[in-house]
């Protein structure tokens, strides 16, 4: 396959599936199996940087608010308002989520060789069930004020989201709603907690960058990143709209359809 077409497909799939609750890693594995398209480490780094840039741009005002309140807290030059305290709690929550996500992610990384194609399809079904359950407006716990417990549960779920076929955004939003957070807040927690995880992952992969074979030139790499960025902006807006309008069951239907089609083809 021509490299230009390959990077366009990879950029499209990464941009769309990183934010929609359909598992980007699961879809990239499907590309590898059926279209013989693999994801070199250097390209993986560029694509993930492009998608995290989408989150930063989309939540730029919210991120600026959090940065300013953190600086205000460090300098202690003025009294903290109730809103400031709420923002500080969100920062603490994201830090706790990141810590437990890293622990689970490291554990899962050690066993990634055991992930079979059938397991990925099973995980697609698990994700579809979680998305369907979100539409029931479940609220089993009311622990949203317990920052540590909330960070623990969401962090574990986000770590599990590293498994191919499990949607990171889907499982973290499910966990947040389970804890009693609103849909809007759950979405915010899910996407903001993605930022430190992606940057941490890019940092760990940086050394591997110089050990990998460069099969794409700089133009092709940048082209793929641009496509990932453009479609990422589209998909994050679409996901926000569909979550607010209780339309996530569409993604459940999509994932079940993908699994059925794959079983038919295989």
Curated annotation (Swiss-Prot):
Its EC number is 3.6.1.27. One of its GO terms (molecular function) is undecaprenyl-diphosphatase activity. Keywords: Antibiotic resistance, Cell inner membrane, Cell membrane, Cell shape, Cell wall biogenesis/degradation, Hydrolase, Membrane, Peptidoglycan synthesis, Transmembrane, Transmembrane helix. It is found in: Cell inner membrane. It is a multi-pass membrane protein. The chain crosses the membrane at residues 4-24, 39-59, 88-108, 114-134, 147-167, 186-206, 214-234, 246-266. GO terms for biological process: cell wall organization; peptidoglycan biosynthetic process; regulation of cell shape; response to antibiotic. One of its GO terms (cellular component) is plasma membrane. InterPro entries: UppP (IPR003824). Belongs to the UppP family. PANTHER family: UNDECAPRENYL-DIPHOSPHATASE (PTHR30622:SF2). Bacitracin is thought to be involved in the inhibition of peptidoglycan synthesis by sequestering undecaprenyl diphosphate, thereby reducing the pool of lipid carrier available. This is Undecaprenyl-diphosphatase. It comes from Borrelia recurrentis (strain A1).
């Amino acid at each position: 396959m021509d490299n230009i077409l390959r990077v366009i497909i990879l950029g499209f799939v990464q941009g769309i599936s990183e934010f929609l609750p359909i598992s980007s890693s699961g879809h990239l594995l499907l590309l590898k199996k059926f279209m013989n398209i693999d994801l070199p480490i250097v390209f993986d780094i560029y694509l993930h940087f492009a998608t995290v840039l989408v989150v930063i741009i989309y939540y730029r005002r919210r991120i600026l608010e959090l940065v300013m309140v953190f600086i205000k807290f460090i300098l202690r030059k003025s009294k903290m308002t109730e809103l400031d305290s709420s923002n500080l709690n969100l920062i603490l929550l994201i830090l706790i989520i990141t810590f437990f996500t890293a622990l689970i992610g490291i554990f899962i990384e050690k066993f990634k060789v055991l992930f079979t194609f059938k397991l990925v399809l099973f995980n697609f079904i698990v994700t579809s069930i979680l998305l369907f359950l979100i539409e029931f407006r479940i609220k089993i716990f009311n622990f949203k004020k317990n920052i540590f417990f909330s960070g623990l549960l969401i962090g574990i779920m986000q770590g599990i989201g590293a498994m191919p076929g499990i949607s990171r955004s889907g499982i973290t939003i499910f966990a947040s709603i389970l804890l009693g957070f609103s849909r809007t807040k759950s979405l915010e927690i899910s996407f903001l907690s993605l930022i430190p995880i992606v940057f941490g992952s890019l940092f760990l992969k940086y050394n591997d960058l110089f050990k990998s074979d460069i099969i794409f030139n700089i133009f092709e790499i940048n082209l793929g990143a641009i496509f990932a960025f453009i479609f990422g902006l589209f998909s994050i807006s679409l996901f926000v709209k569909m979550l607010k309008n209780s339309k996530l069951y569409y993604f459940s239907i999509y994932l079940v359809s993908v699994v059925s089609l794959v079983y038919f083809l295989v």
